[in-house]
């Protein structure tokens, strides 16, 4: 459902072709809500059928260009005002950590090292984005808030992965121990 609102939000800025929207999902939105070509185009068709967007012309290379309708604008504004975001995020990296006990400690630590390295690279990308100036307008301020969130989460994940790898290697009692009888 959030792909719908990501598309509506992008189209609230200006008309885009499907290809241009895909580039946003491969770029700035990749950190928050990645989406594939195979997801974007069917959702655009559903949005058009629902009267939330309309085809307004042709973009580069003859691609269909879409614009937000007044109903689409109302829908995204209502979503921003009224919807409580779901907190059930899927995190494959964390799911794997849950089962690291199946590996020997060296393999488990190596996995955590790779996770820490991934977070370091992601952090470098985000810091590079943060260092580039943008206009002082409401849109940029919103982008910067999301970027700040990404920076903080990425630093925390990097630190956690580094600390966890060290703890696993040392067979340290500081390594988080699973509690028995966990509630689902």
Predicted regions and their residues:
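Amphipathic alpha-helical coiled-coil segments and their boundaries
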Residues: 105, 112, 140-143, 147, ...
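Long amphipathic alpha-helical coiled-coil segments
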Residues: 167-184
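Heptad-repeat amphipathic alpha-helical coiled-coil interaction surface used
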Residues: 109, 116, 123, 130, ...
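Structural signal for well-ordered, non-membrane alpha-helices
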Residues: 48, 73, 120-127, 155, ...
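Acidic interhelical loop/turn segments
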Residues: 127-147
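Basic helix-turn-helix/winged-helix DNA-binding cores
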Residues: 1-89
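Secondary-structure edge/capping motif, primarily at the C-terminal ends of alpha-helices
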Residues: 101, 130-137, 168, 172
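Amphipathic alpha-helical dimerization/coiled-coil segments
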Residues: 78-128
